[in-house]
Structures are given as structure tokens and as C-alpha cells.
Regions:
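Short acidic (Asp/Glu) and glycine-rich catalytic loops that position anionic groups and cofactors
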Residues: 1-6, 35-39, 78-82, 306-310, ...
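Short amphipathic alpha-helical "interface-anchor" segments enriched in bulky aromatics
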Residues: 27, 73, 325-362, 366, ...
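Short, conserved catalytic/metal-binding motifs centered on acidic residues
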Residues: 58-59, 73, 94-98, 135-145, ...
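An anionic, glycine-rich sequence signature occurring as long contiguous blocks
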Residues: 248-345, 431-447
Length: 447
């Protein structure tokens, strides 16, 4: 981030409610993490006190600090000079100024920020360094509702999950399952459906980010070691055939209810699964697709009918998996839905709303970057604090990066961070930060 020059080199101490987050900001500055953002994102807005990219970075830091609205920057970042210095910010703009900057974003600014976010992903993600010889890379994709006001650009009255008919937009996300990283996401109009065109857009974007695009032998071999787990809404014949011919492994469920009823009708014997009440059986006459697949019927007791069942047909190209393992593997896709929910609770996804679609997309990309930074930072800490490896987004935001303490600066550089020993996570976080940040640059200790 941009350096703030004090009038003279002096030692200054600040109390901070986010001292642990100050340590993360110090490390990100040391590795020049924000260089792609500053090089690519240039919003056309008049500069009075802060540059547009500085204001964009202020919103990003506020998200890491747990802000659920732009107004929360006044109670998280603006009142914390130590946090501002740690991330290299010269201060914090008023919340109305930050809102104006977001509203000034254009489609070109969104594209520039997306390029920078993808560049950062390629630099720091584990998914881009996946060992395909060791195991398959699993990608999950889903289309989730994002409530919005009726006057918001792109908002339409449509199916919004449990809310049924409500006004909003849709979020399409591709996730690297083993690493809990968001590979790509975008905000679309409310009535967007899980069609083949949207699937192609999402998969093509994920290929670009992960280096899976192209037709050379090496790239084809990587795609052959990549599995896509999709919601049943993407279980059409056209979508399945396109993915199979593209060279991917696929695990999903058929969309058509009439097709499912036809496939399960001849089945007589069912086997229990690990989930109580749910049963599974092999489909005797599977649907022929572009490449060989195995198909299993799954039935679950209906809550509406005393002796009734809900039926589904699971289709997978992973023929080597036993029937029970194939069903359990598809169940792992639910982690994506839980992850989106945790982003809503921890990072304000769906709560931070802008009327202008470009402004909402800019916020979405900052949220995507914040999600990935939290996941990467958890990995950086676990070398010295393995107990943090199981923490999700909500606990990372609320417990790990909200440890209070005292931050000492020499000039603009953070020299020492003392974390409050009374915090239950302070000892683990301190151990992780000590391994991450060399003592010659910044000393981290317990108060």
C-alpha cells in the first residue's frame, strides 16, 4: 500500500482492538501484497485527500476487521491508527467518501480489479500449486441468492432459496474444495438460472485462473485429474456432455424429475447409507452420455408424506469409487453452501449492498479477496499454531484477527506488536505470527 511519511522519525505507540490484524497487515506490506491492485486499478475520481485505490484498500481492510456495512469503517478502521499504519494507509476516509468511490466504479474498473485479484490468487493460492499426480483437484460450483432492493440494478423478483419469491441478484461461485479457496465468482441478475451458458462462463474463468485452458497434452492431463461437483440444477444432458468432452470428471445429479422417476422405477433392492433413513441403489439402465458414467439412485424419506420418498439420481464419471463413497463424495459439495453462509456472517456478503451493479461487483471482488486472504493467512499461521487449522471464516474474523494489544511504530514501520495475553487465542496466534514474521523486522509478543 502507499507509504505515509511522518514529519520526523519517531517512536509512537498505539492501543489497537485489532493488534493481531495489524501483524497481518505488516506481513502483507513486507511481501508487497497490494502491488497488483495499485498497478491495475485506477478509478477516475478526483483526488482530494486520499487516492481512489487507497479508499478501495480501506474498504478491504474494514472487511477483514469485520465491517458489515460501509458505515462500520468509522468504528473499525477510522478509530484505529495502528491498523491504518500497519496496512500502509495514511488514514481513513469518511464512510460517505468511501461510498462515493464505490459508486464511481465502472465495468472497466471491475475488470481491472478482477485481473488483480486473479493475479494475487495465482501468486498465493494452494490450488494453483495442486499436485495432480497425488490426487484429483475438486472444484465445486453453485448459484446462490443475494437479496437486494427493488431499485437496485440487476435486482429481479425471483426464487431466492428459503425466501421463495423475493427481489435480489445471484452469486455464482467456483471453489477449490480441498483448499477452501474461492477461484472465481461473479454477480448476475436475479433471474439468472443454472444454464449451460453460465456453466461455460464459470468453468472457462476457472480454467484461466488455474491454468487449465488450452489443448496441449499437459493441460489436458490436468483437466483429466480435475473433478467438478455440481448442483442438480446443472445436471442436464447438455451440461454433462460438455464437461465430459472437455475432459473433466463430473459428479452431480440429474435435473429432470421425469427422468429420475423413470430410472428408479425398476429398482427393487436398496442399501442403507451413512445418513439415517437414506438409501441408495445402482440404476439398472443408466442414461447414455458422451463418456461412460455410473449412476446411482438415492431416496430420502419425505417429511410431507408418511410413507413417501424423495428420489434423485447421482451421476459420476468416477467409476472406481464404490457406491457409498460416490454418494459421500457428492455430499462434500455441501461445504460450498456452508462457506457462502459463513461469508455472509463473517464478511458481510449479501449484507453490504449497493444499488449500482458495478459497485456491488467491486464489493464482491473485495470480499472474494478478503476470503482468500483469511484462508491463506490461516495456512501461514498453522506452522506454529496447528489448532487454528480448523477455524472457518467467522471464527477467523471474530477470534483470530480481533486480538487487542499495543502496536509500536518507528516512523512508518511497525516495530513491535504486543498481544493481550488475556485473549483465549493470543498464545496460538502469537506462536504462528512469530514463525511468519522475522523478529528482525517486527517483534510479536504477549503483553
Amino acid at each position: 500500500m502507499s507509504n505515509h511519511t511522518l514529519s520526523s522519525v519517531e517512536r509512537t505507540a498505539f492501543a489497537s482492538s485489532h493488534a493481531s490484524l495489524c501483524a497481518l497487515g505488516t506481513y502483507l506490506r513486507q511481501i508487497d501484497f497490494f502491488a497488483p491492485l495499485e498497478a491495475r486499478v485506477h478509478l477516475k475520481q478526483k483526488v482530494c485527500k486520499y487516492t481512489p485505490i487507497q479508499k478501495v484498500e480501506m474498504v478491504f481492510v474494514a472487511l477483514l476487521a469485520g465491517a458489515k456495512a460501509i458505515t462500520h469503517t468509522s468504528t473499525t478502521l477510522r478509530v484505529d491508527p495502528a491498523l491504518q499504519h500497519a496496512f500502509g494507509l495514511p488514514g481513513c476516509a469518511d464512510q460517505s467518501v468511501l461510498a462515493e468511490t464505490l459508486n464511481a466504479a465502472t465495468d472497466q474498473d471491475v475488470a481491472a480489479l478482477r485481473t488483480a485479484v486473479e493475479e494475487l490468487f495465482q501468486q498465493h493460492s494452494q490450488a494453483c500449486r495442486h499436485d495432480f499426480a497425488q490426487d484429483l483437484l475438486v472444484l465445486d460450483s453453485d448459484l446462490a441468492p443475494l437479496p437486494a432492493s427493488r431499485k437496485a440494478e440487476g435486482a429481479e423478483r425471483c426464487y431466492m432459496g428459503r425466501c421463495r419469491s423475493r427481489t435480489g441478484r445471484k452469486l455464482v461461485r467456483v471453489r477449490a474444495g480441498p483448499y477452501q479457496e474461492t477461484v472465481w465468482e461473479a454477480i448476475r441478475r436475479g433471474r439468472t438460472l443454472e444454464g449451460l451458458d453460465l456453466l461455460k462462463e464459470a468453468v472457462t474463468a476457472a480454467e484461466r485462473v488455474l491454468g487449465l485452458a488450452g489443448d496441449d497434452d499437459g493441460t489436458r492431463a490436468k483437466r483429466a485429474r480435475t473433478e467438478l461437483r455440481l448442483d442438480s440444477s446443472w445436471g442436464s444432458t447438455a451440461a454433462l456432455n460438455w464437461l465430459l468432452l472437455r475432459g473433466y470428471h463430473v459428479t452431480t445429479k440429474f435435473t429432470s424429475t421425469s427422468r429420475v422417476q423413470k430410472l428408479v422405477r425398476p429398482i427393487q433392492a436398496w442399501q442403507p447409507t451413512a445418513s439415517p433413513g437414506r438409501e441408495v441403489a445402482a440404476v439398472p439402465e443408466p442414461v447414455r452420455l458422451a463418456k461412460p458414467t455410473v449412476q446411482y439412485a438415492v431416496r430420502t424419506p419425505s417429511k410431507e408424506q408418511a410413507a413417501g420418498y424423495h428420489y434423485a439420481v447421482l451421476v459420476t464419471s468416477r467409476a472406481e469409487l464404490p457406491m457409498q463413497a460416490a454418494v459421500d463424495r457428492y455430499d462434500g459439495r455441501a461445504a460450498l453452501e456452508a462457506e457462502i453462509k459463513s461469508d455472509k456472517q463473517g464478511l458481510g456478503l449479501g449484507v453490504l449492498r449497493k444499488r449500482k451493479l458495478a459497485a456491488q461487483e467491486l464489493l464482491g471482488l473485495l470480499g472474494q479477496l478478503a476470503h482468500n486472504v483469511l484462508i491463506w493467512a490461516r495456512g501461514w499461521l498453522t506452522g506454529g499454531a496447528p489448532r487454528l487449522a480448523t477455524f472457518g471464516i467467522v471464527r477467523l474474523v471474530r477470534e483470530v484477527w480481533t486480538i487487542p494489544g499495543r502496536v509500536t511504530l518507528v516512523g512508518t514501520q511497525v516495530q513491535r506488536i504486543r498481544l493481550s495475553a488475556l485473549h483465549p487465542r493470543a498464545r496460538d496466534v502469537c506462536a504462528g505470527l512469530r514463525r511468519l514474521i522475522p523478529p528482525s523486522q517486527t517483534r510479536v509478543a504477549l503483553a
